[in-house]
């Protein structure tokens, strides 16, 4: 039976490269000289540092620019709150989404069931597997998911015939 998986995975190598390029640009930019503006990545968390919130915004803009140049969708970024750290400095943690959250997986499953297309959607850990009798039905479901769910960058892989 034909099937495919719906996943939400960022290319972490490209994300890491974008963060390193952002750090390099922050180090050379004139408006960041003598400030504590910095960016670092650990696992799937990017941490922005700055002297004020506007500086965090500038660092985030640099990061978004570098991610876009490397063809990484910025919707993978899940911004946290701005936190004050020692003195006048602030930081912000941005998590890189990897995997579909359970609420979104249930929403996708419900969407597929309500479409009346003859396919089954099963939630498997951090992905949703869609199985059907015909390849055309699966392609219709892909189009439906792309059309209805736009706030999260979903991709389809493991297409089996």
From Swiss-Prot:
Superkingdom assignment: Bacteria
CDD domains: YajQ_like
InterPro entries per record: DUF520, UPF0234-like_C, UPF0234_N, YajQ-like_sf
GO molecular function per UniProt: nucleotide binding
Single GO cellular component term: cytosol
Keyword terms of this UniProt record: Nucleotide-binding
This protein's record includes keyword Membrane: no
Presence of keyword Nucleotide-binding: yes
TM annotation in the entry: none
Matches recorded under SUPFAM superfamilies: YajQ-like (SSF89963)
Family as reported in the entry's similarity comment: Belongs to the YajQ family.
General function of this protein: Nucleotide-binding protein.
UniProt-recorded name of the protein: Nucleotide-binding protein Aave_1854
Source species: Paracidovorax citrulli (strain AAC00-1) (Acidovorax citrulli)
């Amino acid at each position: 039976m034909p099937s495919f998986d719906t996943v939400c995975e960022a290319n972490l190598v490209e994300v890491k490269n974008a963060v390193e390029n952002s750090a390099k640009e922050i180090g050379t930019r004139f408006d960041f000289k003598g400030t504590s503006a910095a960016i670092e990545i650990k696992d799937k968390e990017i941490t922005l540092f700055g002297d004020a919130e506007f500086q965090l915004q500038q660092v985030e803009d640099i990061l978004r620019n570098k991610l876009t140049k490397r063809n990484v969708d910025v919707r993978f970024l899940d911004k946290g709150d701005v936190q004050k750290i020692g003195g006048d400095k602030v930081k912000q943690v941005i998590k890189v989404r990897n995997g579909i959250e359970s609420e979104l997986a249930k929403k996708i499953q419900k969407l597929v069931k309500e479409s009346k297309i003859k396919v089954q959607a099963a939630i498997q850990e951090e992905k949703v597997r869609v199985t059907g009798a015909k390849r055309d039905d699966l392609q219709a479901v892909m189009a439906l998911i792309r059309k209805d769910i736009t706030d999260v960058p979903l991709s389809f892989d493991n297409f089996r015939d």
